[in-house]
Structures are given as structure tokens and as C-alpha cells.
Amino acid sequence: MGEREFIIYLDPQERLNRYRHYHAWQGNQIIEFRIQHEAFIGDEWHPIVRYDTAHGKPHRDILHPDGVETKEWFELYSNAETLTIGQSDIV
């Protein structure tokens, strides 16, 4: 099994938005992933949107300012496909 984790600033000059990425693979299969857009608001990093495989299935969480989370399941997509969709959405 291999793992990869990194952070990319989406606005390198201001450094107020970043893309956090983690994925694990076995052979040629993505077995787990977690990626999210985070924004620096009020002296803290806050997740805005997250794609991951928590709860056993790939999905997207939109994290609203009032604390409410909206969840969308990607049941018809593989982990690798959902990871690609999430990367395209965030970056």
C-alpha cells in the first residue's frame, strides 16, 4: 500500500485558500482518499468542500458557514473517478 499527502495554495500570493490532498492505493486501486478546499477566515482554516471515502463510500460534503453539512453520494463512481471529479472541482 502507498500513501500520498500534500497541500497546494490556490492563491500563492495571499495564501488564503488551499487544497489539502490525501490518498492511499493498493496496486492500481485508490482504496481511500480525502481532499478538501480550505479557506483562511478569521485567523483559522475552515473546510469549505470535502470529497472523501469516509463512511465506506465516496461522497462530497459542502460545509456551510452556519455549520450545516450537505452530503452528496457518488455511488455510481469508483474512488478514483470521484477523486478526479473532486480535484477538478476544487483546483
Model-derived features: where do they sit?
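Generic detector of leucine side chains in alpha-helical contexts
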Residues: 10, 16, 40, 63, ...
